[in-house]
Each structure stands twice: as C-alpha cells, then as structure tokens.
A protein has these predicted regions:
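Short coil/turn motif common to extracellular beta-sandwich-like domains
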Residues: 384, 403-410
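Small-residue (G/S/T/A) turn/hinge positions that recur once per unit in extracellular repeat modules
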Residues: 393-402, 429
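Extended, compositionally biased alpha-helical segments that mediate assembly or anchoring
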Residues: 1-61, 65, 283-383
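Extended oligomerization regions of viral-like shell subunits
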Residues: 213-335
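Long, contiguous amphipathic alpha-helices that act as assembly "spine/axial" helices in icosahedral shell
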Residues: 124-197, 357-361
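Conserved "repeat-terminator" motif of extracellular CCP/Sushi domains
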Residues: 383-390, 436-458
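Surface-exposed interfaces of beta-sheet-rich extracellular modules
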Residues: 408-434
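Assembly/oligomerization interface modules of large self-assembling protein complexes
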Residues: 51-140
C-alpha cells in the first residue's frame, strides 16, 4: 500500500498525540518533522504506546482508502447488506381460489357468509447454504528498535509503515478474494447439482450436427455467436416470472439491474476477438453487473482453460460433490449468493523482555447461497449417449439420444395389447412420470441406458 508524504505526516502526528496523551499537551516542542517526533517519544519512553497508536491510526486510514476501492465482485457485501441477505423470508405465490362473495349454495336459497378463517396460504421460509464462516486472523511481530530507526527521515518512515502493513493488507485482500470465489463456486455447484445448467457445446453439436471440441469451440465464430445468443436469451427469459431458473422451484424473476453476469476471461476474450461488435455479446457486457473473472477456483501455473474453468466443491448441503470443468459463464440474481468479510479490528501486545510488539488483525468472514433466487451455469463439455434396453411386450422411443446436462429427454412408451407400463428407470432411479405412457429423463453428460418394463393388465 502506498502513502504520500502528507498522509505519513498526519498519521505519525496523530499517533504521537495518542501515545503521549496529556504529557504531549504540556510540551511546546516542534512536531512538524520526524526527527522531532522521534525525540518526543524518546523523552517519554513512549515507543510502545506509539506503535499501538500508529497501528490503530493506519487501520482507520486503510478503512478510509478502501471506501473508494469498491468490490471487484458484486457478491461481496458489507455487514448490513449481508445481514439482510441471510434474514430473508419468502412468500409463496398463492393459487387463485373461488371467492364466495357472490355465491349462492346450489344456485338457490340465501347467501351464506364465508368464514374469514378458511385461508390456508402459508409463508415459505428460505433455507440457505452457509459456508466459510469463521474469523480470519493474521499476526506479525516487529522489534521496537525498528520504530526508532524509522524516525530518521520521511522515506524511512514510509518504508516502515509500508513494510508493516503491506503483508497484512495483501493477506486481507487475498482472503477476501478467496471467500468470494468460494461463495460463487458453491453457488455454481448448487445449480449444477440441481440441474440448473446448460452444456452449450453439446447443445450446439446436437443442433447443428457438428463435432466441435472445447478447443475448437473457442475459436469458432459460429459457436461463440450461438453461445452469446443463448446466454443473452437466458438473461431475458429470467426477467419473466418462472420456476425454471432456480433450484428451489420458486416463482420469481430477475430484472436487468439485479442480474449478475460473471464471464470467464478467456471466453470473454474469445468473443471479443471473433465477434467484435456482435449485438448479443455487446448486450451482455452492457449489463450493470457484468464482470470478467480470470478463473473460478484456481489458475494453475499457466492459466490454462481447463484449470481456470473448473470447480471442485464438496458441501454438506449438496446432494453430491460437484466437479465440473469448462464453465464459461454464471448468470444469477444478485440475491443468489453473498459473501462477507468485514468487522475488521486490530490489537497489539507488547513484550518488553524481547522488545517486540505483536500486532494482530481479525475479521469475520462467511458466505451464503440462496437457491430460491435465479442462477444458471453455462459450460462446455462432452456429451454422452442415451439408449433403450431391450423391451418385451411393447416398444419405446426417445425424443433425443444425446446426453448432456440440461437436456430433458421424453420417453414415449407403447405397450403391447393387454399390457401397461410398470416402470421406467435408469439404474435404480425411476424417471419422472408425465402420464401413463410418457416419462421424463433429466440427462447428465454421461452415457445412460433407459429400461422400460411392461406388465400384463390384471
């Protein structure tokens, strides 16, 4: 962290005043230069008090400077915003019911007064995924002799302060970045775990009968245009009331000003290069909460695409551990995920025997994911094949034979005369029943064999 000369003078002057207290007000010595300040401290043997005062003063100054930095990710919230995030209550939209105002029993007779206590709509309370909760702490030790030598000249004092707090501030920013990344990655894992994700590469290859790989897709203008269009279309669709874009199946919508678009930098660079002024891409980058992200969880040594686009998340509230590569974009309501890293405070302990001062800093940290809010993951991955096992006493057909996450395949069953469908499953998992002859399979990116079993009518 860099300070200018005027900042250094103000910081040190205020710190000396704090260290000397009432004694300082009784002196008339000049305190406009560092040498005089050093003499003042020496006269009152107040180096230890000065160090503590200096630490607190710098912390206050850092807070003031940090106010103008802003967050690099919209996920990071202050204490009040985070408190509001984790205390949300959701109201489920009630179904329309017949109102008895104008009703007459059986169409004849007198009006019957309806009871005001027959309303049965309930309030739904959200359940959040919490993680990363705890206290961040870092400690450093500085010899008191360093304080004395820092008063030789302004540059020495600047070096002293920078050396004292640069490591602390870097650690603070790194931890802030890590808790933010962990929050976003857990939110993506939750969406992937719930099937709220789209494999754009598999979709493109299936739709246009292509065989692009992840590598060739990133240099294909046609694919990049398709991907940008689909992401942009999802952003617009999320503006309509729907349950399609959140894991909890909650009826909600996301307006453009509340939409966060987090784009992997390598994919964003590819679209910039190959699409240039393409309308779909420009509409995405123009959104108020558009953010470029160099990597989701790790950069690796070379910032290669496979590493930067991957997440590997384990959380007790997820049904499965989630490991996914090729993630290029995460669009979500600003209420989907929040991280907090604040309530920062400092402390000092003087060890007179060793003539050192131990300086420590603490901050509260944590994050939460809300599955009631809209969130969709877009990624590039390979696809699998869906097939039917041999069927006795009937037949069946698939709406698609390509397996990729987000592809809902309809199984149409045709029992032979005198038979009906007993079960339709993949392994031990029964497929969702639509009606007596139609079933839905939510595909993954893996191969799958669907077994249809017919049973004779009784």
């Amino acid at each position: 962290m860099a300070y200018n000369v005027s900042q250094i003078k103000n910081i040190v002057n205020d710190s000396v005043k704090d260290a000397l207290g009432a004694n300082y007000s009784a002196t008339k010595q000049e305190t406009s230069d560092f040498v005089s300040l050093g003499k003042q401290l020496a006269n009152f043997n107040a180096y230890e008090g000065f160090f503590g005062a200096l630490a607190n003063r710098i912390v206050r100054t850092i807070y003031f400077i940090r106010t103008y930095e802003g967050s690099s990710r919209s996920v990071l919230r202050d204490e009040h915003e985070y408190g509001a995030f984790i205390q949300k209550v959701y109201y489920d939209l009630p179904e329309a019911v017949d109102n008895p105002t104008w009703s007459i029993p059986n169409g004849v007779g007198k009006y019957v007064q309806a009871s005001p206590y027959d309303v049965q709509a309930i309030v739904g309370v959200s359940s959040l995924i919490f993680g990363g909760k705890g206290t961040w702490s870092i400690e450093i030790v500085r010899p008191i002799e360093q304080i004395k030598s820092a008063f030789l000249e302004e540059s020495a004092m600047m070096n002293f302060i920078s050396g004292l707090y640069e490591a602390v501030e870097n650690a603070f920013k790194l931890q802030e970045e890590e808790i933010t990344n962990l929050a976003v990655n857990t939110a993506m894992a939750s969406s992937l775990d719930g099937g709220i994700a789209r494999n754009l590469l598999a979709e493109y290859n299936a739709k246009y009968s292509q065989s692009l790989t992840v590598a060739t897709a990133l240099i294909s203008a046609d694919f990049l245009r398709f991907a940008s269009k689909e992401i942009n279309r999802a952003v617009k669709n999320m503006g309509k009331m729907s349950t399609a874009f959140n894991k909890a199946g909650y009826k909600t919508f996301t307006t453009p000003d509340r939409m966060v678009v987090e784009m992997l930098s390598e994919f964003a660079s590819a679209t910039d290069m190959y699409l240039q002024s393409d309308t779909f891409h420009d509409e995405l980058t123009a959104l108020p909460n558009y953010e470029d992200v160099p990597f989701w969880q790790a950069s690796g040594k070379d910032f290669d695409f496979n590493t930067c686009s991957s997440i590997n998340i384990e959380h007790d509230d997820l049904d499965n551990d989630v490991s996914q590569s090729g993630i290029i974009c995460f669009i979500h309501d600003i209420e989907n995920v929040a991280a907090y890293f604040g309530n920062r405070r400092a402390w000092e302990i003087v060890n007179p025997r060793s003539e050192v001062v131990v300086h420590g800093e603490k901050a509260e940290k944590g994050f939460a994911v809300d599955d009631h809010a809209n969130a969709v993951v877009f990624y590039l991955g390979s696809s699998g094949t869906v097939s039917l096992a041999e069927i006795e006493h009937g037949s069946a057909s698939l709406s698609s034979s390509v397996a990729y996450r987000g592809n809902n395949i309809i199984v149409t069953c045709t029992p032979a005369s005198g038979y009906h469908v007993k079960s339709v499953n993949v392994g031990d998992v029964d497929l969702e029943k639509i009606d007596n002859t139609h079933y839905a399979y939510k595909a993954t990116d893996s191969n799958a064999t669907i077994t249809v079993t017919m049973e004779a009518n009784s």
